[in-house]
Amino acid sequence: MHFRPLHDRVLVRRIDAEEKTAGGIIIPDTAKEKPQEGEIIAAGSGGRNEQGQLIPIDVKPGDRVLFGKWSGTEVKIDGQDYLIMKESDLLGVVDKTGSVKKAA
């Protein structure tokens, strides 16, 4: 199945957190927090301003993003868990070089 978000919404796949600490301690599933990092799978065309002009989305499929712990709506598509959220719920884009750039 193919899913295309509408307007300024994005489809995000969570990127799982590390299962071990830096010191080698294994973190059990019950103690893990929901990851706050994910990958953009699909993005809508953008929102509209008061004049009706299209405001394009700043993220694209493949971007790694950070978001709030309680952001988005959890959905299951083809057995895979995803989040659907507005672009404004994203905190920023993680650059592959390790630096962070701001999203709109």
Swiss-Prot record:
Gene: groES1
Biological processes annotated in GO: chaperone cofactor-dependent protein refolding
Protein family according to the UniProt entry: Belongs to the GroES chaperonin family.
InterPro entries tied to this protein: Chaperonin_GroES, Chaperonin_GroES_sf, Chaprnonin_Cpn10_CS, GroES-like_sf
Source superkingdom: Bacteria
Annotated protein name in UniProt: Co-chaperonin GroES 1
CDD domains listed in its UniProt record: cpn10 (cd00320)
Induction: By heat shock.
Keyword Transmembrane among record annotations: no
UniProt GO molecular function: ATP binding; metal ion binding; protein folding chaperone; protein-folding chaperone binding; unfolded protein binding
Keywords: Chaperone, Cytoplasm, Stress response
